[in-house]
Amino acid sequence: YSNDEIAIGGDSAGGNLSLVTFLKLRELNEALPAAMICISPWADPAATGESYNEEMADKDPLIGPLFKKIWSKFNMKSAIGYYVKKEDVDQSNPFICPINGDFSGCPPVMIQVGADELLLSDSRSMINVFERDGVIHEYKEWENLWHVFQLDGEMEESTKSFEMFR
């Protein structure tokens, strides 16, 4: 396939990897995909956004309990140490925290996120980055839904979500 027939995408940490893949391809002057789809992208592993709080964790049945455990049991602000080695943590590095990247020249991107999920601010921050950098994008925030709700294939919203990818 040629690059204009390829879209990349991922959910959660896979959304992070999709965003970082674009940055790396552009840095290497490689062909870019035609489009990107990010479902609840973990674009701020440093957890600097406003949605990283107890209230949102209580609403998010998928990752809320994990983050609450990280916050209380391990006294950590974020889970970034599970993503990169402690000595490599640099939240200003866009290859770790895409919210700090320059997305000029990025192909069109679709982001979908649950309005009741812990990573909500990650998606909102990425939309701000895309608007700043002139990236064509589509954004859908699903009311009363949690992180990667699309995994529940029985929900009507999951079906509608996947129909939007066409």
Predicted regions mapped to residue ranges:
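Alpha/beta-hydrolase superfamily serine-hydrolase fold, recognizing
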Residues: Y1-R166
